[in-house]
Amino acid sequence: MNRTIRRHTLRALLAALCIAPLGMQGAARADAPLKIGFLVKMPEQAWFINEQNAASALGQKENFSVVKIGTPDGEKVLAAIDNLGSQGAQGFVICAPDVRLGPAIAARAKRYNMKFVTVDDQLVDSTGKPLPNVPHLGMSATKIGNQVGQAISDEMKRRGWKPEEVGALRITNYELPTAKLRTDGATQALLANGFRKENIFDAPQKTTDDEGGFSAAAPVLARHPNVKKWVVYALNEETVLGAVRATEQLHIPAADVIGVGINGAGEAFAEFQKKEPTGFYGTIAVSSTNHGKDSTQNLVEWIRDGKTPPADTQTSGKLMTRANWQAVRAELGI
């Protein structure tokens, strides 16, 4: 009888030992200050630096901490989520390096009972559709692209360029749905303004930075020495700036190039401050600061108050050029 009682008592103690850590973790997590992560695919780019800094600034103001992590590939994304889980983080904002990582990211977040929202690039499921139940904040990619194409068309008219004498360098990344929507939107606007379809030349890029833009643009420009005037567009301003550097290497005058990017960040500001104008005419500026702040605010309110963020929030942009960049920067708070 006593042996049976001791056996049952031992089992109860073992069960309690197994359960206690889980309960203690839950209590610690409930009492500890809120911690979230902010994961970005290219932590060295000014756009993402601004987003993460805006998240941290909001955290200081509203009493939560932000763990800033660079995640340039899928393996690092999953490792970052594990890292956040071990720190007791309750959620994260993410701009993933590959939108097709959606199901894997969702599964890993579920393992740690973490909420997450996406910013800039919307995650997709195995069928290519937006990942369900994951709030997103980004740009209206097609409309932003339309703005790029319209800005180029307006500047062509201002300079008196004839469509038949102009080539368009379309730097493409069709692996990233957002990139395709942006360049397709720009193409739509150009064609609607009378640009010749046969004068649009594709330049596939491998990376979405300056180097990727340069590497994509240089061989295409070199293959068409008969084209004397060029317009350039892509998914972001870094890529366009890389392409502009390629035109300079081939001694194409800056006055014969109209490059328009998307974002409105540090590299564009530096370009506008150069002593002489370059082929980088402008960029459709969107507030990276607001993207970082608003996506973080959405996540924190979801965690703290149970307020589910909107499923899909789309922001708009404004043309920023050498003439108005300081005013636009102040207006957008970037």
From Swiss-Prot:
A biological process from GO: L-arabinose transmembrane transport
Entry keyword set: Periplasm, Signal, Sugar transport, Transport
One GO MF term: carbohydrate binding
Gene3D superfamilies given in the database record: 3.40.50.2300
tRNA processing recorded as keyword: no
One matching Pfam family: Peripla_BP_1
Record-level GO cellular component terms: outer membrane-bounded periplasmic space
Main location: periplasm
InterPro entries to which the protein is assigned, alphabetical: AraF (IPR026266), Bact_Solute-Bind_Prot2 (IPR050555), Peripla_BP/Lac1_sug-bd_dom (IPR001761), Peripla_BP_I (IPR028082)
Subcellular localization, as worded in the UniProt entry: Periplasm
Subunit relationships: The complex is composed of two ATP-binding proteins (AraG), two transmembrane proteins (AraH) and a solute-binding protein (AraF).
Function: Part of the ABC transporter complex AraFGH involved in L-arabinose import. Binds with high affinity to L-arabinose.
Family: Belongs to the bacterial solute-binding protein 2 family.
PANTHER family: D-XYLOSE-BINDING PERIPLASMIC PROTEIN, L-ARABINOSE-BINDING PERIPLASMIC PROTEIN
Protein name: ABC transporter L-arabinose-binding periplasmic protein
Organism: Azospirillum brasilense
Gene of this entry: araF
